[in-house]
Amino acid sequence: MPQNADSVLDHENLFRQPEYRELFARKKEEFEFAVPLDKVQDVAEWTKTKEYQQKNFAREALTINPAKACQPLGAVYAAVGFQNTLPFVHGSQGCVAYYRSHFSRHFKEPTSCVSSSMTEDAAVFGGLNNMIDGLANALSLYKPEMIAVSTTCMAEVIGDDLDSFIKNAKDKGSVPAEYDVPFAHTPAFVGSHVTGYDNALKGILTHFWDGKAGTVPALERKPNERINFIGGFDGFVVGNLPEVKRIFKLMGVDGTIVCDPSEVWNTPTDGQFRMYSGGTTKQEVIEALDAKATVVFQEFSTLKTAKYIAEKGQEVVTLNHPMGVAGTDQFLMELSRLSGQPIPAELELERGRLVD
């Protein structure tokens, strides 16, 4: 029901009106990927049982990786997978400190990421000045080829518009007008780290394929026989992606790994610090549009990205991680079908040894 001067509802009652209930329900269905309410209730009841109590108190590990983190953490993961790219989180320093420490603890490698250092004044008046100064400082200090921007709760609650802010920052001379600054809105109070990974990856592809926020013409797809591969939000990426690359090479498949953080989180101890290492190049991202198909691991890590790629005319094959013989067989057979290449004897030999 619309507000008017004669009948102004308090927020507690306003948000109970039918139009708001419908809006919240649609948001939950389309953006939060929520499970059914009866399932939520079942789990809630289970947490009150003796079984859950015993399971909860039986933990022995001092440190447990969270099963669910917030969107910007996933966005940082996605940004790290591109060559010479600096993740830039529009929000407070404390949030970014958490993302860096989380990844560094897990991979035992330093993780580079910066923030726009929003504080109380930015929370009230908006973070445009923080974006202007932050982009300029990031480019000057760390010399990335690309800065991938995401957001935290603070920026999203006040409604900061990344597209507008980045264009204003370029107008102010923070970075050159032609400099690549892909972005994605990643509100931490919706979804999880896999949602943020999905949003950020789609944001980077959209930036290059759809005309860099309207500043250049959109790319026209010219199909070829290449195969793209997206591994999803993978905590074992430093071992899994090199194996995927080996399989592509053994089969003679001409392919592109879209988002490859396997090197930056697996640098050698040789006395040299590498802020950037490996990753998908900008040219590879551009050429990925023309690929015949894209193979995706972890369906729920890339719901929006997979849909976007399919809308561009590519075949998208979504698989679970190929754990075990059956899963690996499915991956290899799909790769063979898409590429027209036979499965090599070396891989058949490895399979035989495993079965034996």
UniProtKB/Swiss-Prot annotation:
Keywords recorded for this protein, A-Z: ATP-binding, Iron, Iron-sulfur, Metal-binding, Nitrogen fixation, Nucleotide-binding, Oxidoreductase
Gene Ontology molecular function, alphabetical: ATP binding; iron-sulfur cluster binding; metal ion binding; nitrogenase activity
EC category name: oxidoreductase
An individual GO BP term: nitrogen fixation
Record's catalysed reaction(s): N2 + 8 reduced [2Fe-2S]-[ferredoxin] + 16 ATP + 16 H2O = H2 + 8 oxidized [2Fe-2S]-[ferredoxin] + 2 NH4(+) + 16 ADP + 16 phosphate + 6 H(+)
Matches recorded under InterPro entries: ChlB/BchB/BchZ, Nase/OxRdtase_comp1, Nase_comp1_CS, Nase_Mo-Fe_CF_bsu, Nase_Mo-Fe_CF_bsu_N
Keyword hit for Metal-binding: yes
GO cellular component, as recorded: molybdenum-iron nitrogenase complex
EC number, as in UniProt: 1.18.6.1
Coiled coil start-end: none
Record: residues binding [8Fe-7S] cluster: C70, C95, C153
UniProt cofactor note: Binds 1 [8Fe-7S] cluster per heterodimer.
Cofactor(s) needed for function: [8Fe-7S] cluster
Miscellaneous: Ala-188 is present instead of the usual Ser that would serve as a ligand for the 8Fe-7S cluster in the oxidized state.
Subunit composition and interactions: Tetramer of two alpha and two beta chains. Forms complex with the iron protein (nitrogenase component 2).
Family affiliation: Belongs to the NifD/NifK/NifE/NifN family.
Reported function: This molybdenum-iron protein is part of the nitrogenase complex that catalyzes the key enzymatic reactions in nitrogen fixation.
Name of the protein described by the UniProt record: Nitrogenase molybdenum-iron protein beta chain
Organism from which the protein derives: Herbaspirillum seropedicae
